[in-house]
Amino acid sequence: MTDLCNLRCRYCMPDGVDKLEREDILTYEEFLRLAALFARCGVDTVRVTGGEPLVRKGVEQLVKGLKAIPGIRKVTMTTNAVLLEQQLPALLEAGLDSVNISLDTLDPALFAKITARDEFAAVQAGIHAALESGIPVKLNCVPQVGVNEGELEALAALAQDKPLQVRFIEMMPIGYGAAMPCISGPELLVRFRRRWPELAPLPGAACAALGDGPAVYYTVPGWKGDIGFIAAVHGKFCASCNRVRLTSQGFLRPCLASEAGCDLKALLRSGASDEELLTAIRTTIWEKPQEHHFELKQDIPATRGMYRIGG
């Protein structure tokens, strides 16, 4: 819903990137019109992302509008949590169902190095507020070679006494992350099992209950939370992928690794009817590529930042 962010993580949106013009971004009314059409196609879950969604004013009104759409059963948000503590009450009142929080380190100095901002205390306050509120919380960590790889066990251990899911997402070869080496999910699982030999996978039904996507979850008896792995490169899950992404500019992308898609904003602003938009949405979804080829690291523009796609 926005390309703006109040952090500058080097693998997503480093300093110096160009901002989009305001008129290039979909309005909330346009987002809601499209969301209602997606619901007519069978979409029942919407995740609000950015950039950082909380930097866009009135985001709680978007959440409220999404929750009012027939067929939409769940609205979630991915955030860096810098502004979460102050905005959480309004989001909860609007009906937000869960929150995913990006966190790559528990070290304030390393946090500042990764993000180029000194906001660790604000993020911790946001996480604490979310846990205290009772809303389901997931933490998303991107393991980075030579950066935070020594902290991954400490991050995983948060699930021991907190009711949350700590997920480890492989670095995707997209945009600024393409030049960075990947710590694979299977490699990380071996490491964690050396630390916690009792770490065992949750049954499929339990995994499904925790989320709507590709994460595979593990836990240790007695833990309050779980550890998840999203291994897009080393554990390709294309056959079961149930995602499409609508960028802040209104471009519908059926696959992160593909340039294929449809400019829904152009259709919206040229006066397209709902039926014409539905046809475009359905056609794009049906043309979703069979699988990605992240392992080949080709045909993916090096400057296509995740902050503009929906990270």
Place the predicted regions along the sequence by residue.
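Short, small-residue-enriched loops and turns at beta-alpha junctions
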Residues: M1, L20, E52-R56, Q144-N148, ...
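Canonical Radical SAM [4Fe-4S] cluster-binding loop centered on the CxxxCxxC motif
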Residues: T2-E29
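Residues that scaffold the ATP/ADP-binding catalytic core of kinase and kinase-like folds
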Residues: R8, C12, R56, A109, ...
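Auxiliary Fe-S-binding modules of radical SAM enzymes
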Residues: D161, M171-G311
